[in-house]
Every structure is written in structure tokens, then in C-alpha cells.
């Protein structure tokens, strides 16, 4: 037998040994993949909860699971609610899973005034901007639309505290509106609660009033700019 033939036979024998060796190993169907389960938090009564002004706020509850395991006891709740003051309060529920990954959800608690019966919801047009900064002379917002939406008696959202300055007049689009919330009192007064815009400006003040005879809304807004606007349907 030649050396070449011996080499070929040896290679076949080695291959057979390797095959037998692999076939004799137990395969349990598992691999090195690992799945982590984030904590899933479910809010009872949903992510928006109404509380009447002057009543007592009690958290409506929540449950949490990590995979199939109940981990409700691991949830941390943060955020205060003043049931004596109209406003929109954020309550956050958070938890960390066994691998150190965090998850959270937020509930908006709306403290409303049941004594407020007037609803000023609607889409209004800007009819004047008297007393405003000169930027509103260079970029007129007259004729732009502003939508007020009642969330609960005495609580409203506003589509744009800047009356469409960037969103419409300058033409950047709705993403550049200054949205927000305000409280509406039974005396027809308006008080700003919060605002949000792409530049994260802080609300200095928002005051105003509604005239039930004319149906007009007047707002004095100071959020980066000073805008005094009258709105009419």
C-alpha cells in the first residue's frame, strides 16, 4: 500500500471518528440565546384619571408582570396630586427587571372643577394681537386658527399658545406649535397650567378671560414671546 493511499485511509478514519463523536453527544435543543422580559405595567382605570376638585385622590391601582411572574410589589410610584387645585398632574410608575432594565408608564391625573358648566371648546380665529411684541407685527398671526379642547370641566388643551407663529405663518408645520393646558374658572377666567414647544421654553405666565356675551376669548401669553391675542369663532 502506497503512502498516498495510507494517507487517504487515515483521513477517512478521522472523519468517521469525528462524525461518531458528534452523533454521540446529547443535544438538548438549547442554544446560547437569552431573552430578557421587561416589566409590563398595566394601569387600572387607564392612563387618564379624573378627580373632582376638593375631593380626595386615591390611586386607582396597577399591576405589573415580568414574563409570567407577578412583580406588582416591585413598582415604584412617583408624583404628587393636589386634589384642591385644578391642574394636570403626572404620576409615574416604574420598575426594574432582574437584568437591570427599567420600564415606566405615566398616568395623567386631571383635577377638574365640577362647578364649571361653561364649555368654550372650539376652533377660533385670531382677530387681534394688541400689545404684543413686534415679532407679531413682522409675522402676523391674524386669521390663524387656535383650537381649545375641553378635557374635563374647567380643564383645556390649546393647540398653539403662539397662535400659529411658527406652525402656520412662518410655515414650519404643526410640530413647531406651542401646545399646552389651561384652567378655566367659573368666573370665566383663564390661567395657564403648562406649555410645550420644540425649544423647551418655560411658561412665564398665561392669563385671560372669556366673554359669554360675545363668545370671544382673550389671552395674555408670556412664553418666550409676549402675545396678547383675541380669539373669535
Residue spans for each PLM region:
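Bacterial Sec-dependent N-terminal signal peptides
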Residues: 2-47, 116
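Ser/Thr/Gly/Pro-rich, low-complexity flexible regions
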Residues: 115-233
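Edge beta-strands of extracellular beta-sandwich domains
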Residues: 103-109, 229-230
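Serine/threonine-rich, repeat-prone extracellular segments and beta-strand-based repeat modules
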Residues: 69-102, 111-112
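Solvent-exposed, low-complexity, repeat-rich "mucin-like" stalks and linkers
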Residues: 37-69, 152, 165
Amino acid at each position: 500500500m502506497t503512502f498516498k493511499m495510507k494517507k487517504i485511509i487515515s483521513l477517512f478514519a478521522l472523519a468517521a471518528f469525528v462524525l461518531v463523536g458528534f452523533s454521540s453527544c446529547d443535544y438538548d435543543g438549547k442554544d446560547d440565546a437569552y431573552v430578557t422580559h421587561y416589566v409590563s405595567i398595566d394601569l387600572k382605570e387607564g392612563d387618564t384619571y379624573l378627580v373632582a376638585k376638593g375631593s380626595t385622590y386615591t390611586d386607582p391601582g396597577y399591576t405589573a408582570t415580568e414574563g409570567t411572574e407577578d412583580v406588582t410589589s416591585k413598582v415604584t410610584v412617583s408624583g404628587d396630586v393636589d386634589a384642591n387645585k385644578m391642574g394636570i398632574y403626572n404620576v409615574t410608575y416604574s420598575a426594574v427587571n432582574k437584568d437591570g432594565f427599567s420600564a415606566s408608564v405615566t398616568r395623567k391625573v386631571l383635577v377638574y372643577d365640577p362647578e364649571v358648566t361653561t364649555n368654550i371648546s372650539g376652533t377660533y380665529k385670531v382677530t387681534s394681537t394688541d400689545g404684543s411684541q413686534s415679532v407679531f407685527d413682522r409675522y402676523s398671526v391674524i386669521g390663524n386658527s387656535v383650537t381649545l379642547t375641553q378635557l374635563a370641566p374647567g380643564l383645556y388643551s390649546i393647540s398653539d399658545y403662539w397662535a400659529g407663529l411658527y406652525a402656520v405663518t412662518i410655515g414650519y408645520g404643526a410640530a413647531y406649535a406651542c401646545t399646552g393646558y389651561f384652567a378655566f374658572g367659573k368666573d370665566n377666567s383663564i390661567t395657564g397650567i403648562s406649555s410645550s414647544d420644540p425649544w423647551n421654553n418655560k411658561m412665564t405666565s398665561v392669563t385671560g378671560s372669556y366673554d359669554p356675551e360675545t363668545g370671544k376669548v382673550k389671552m395674555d401669553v408670556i412664553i418666550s414671546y409676549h402675545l396678547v391675542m383675541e380669539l373669535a369663532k
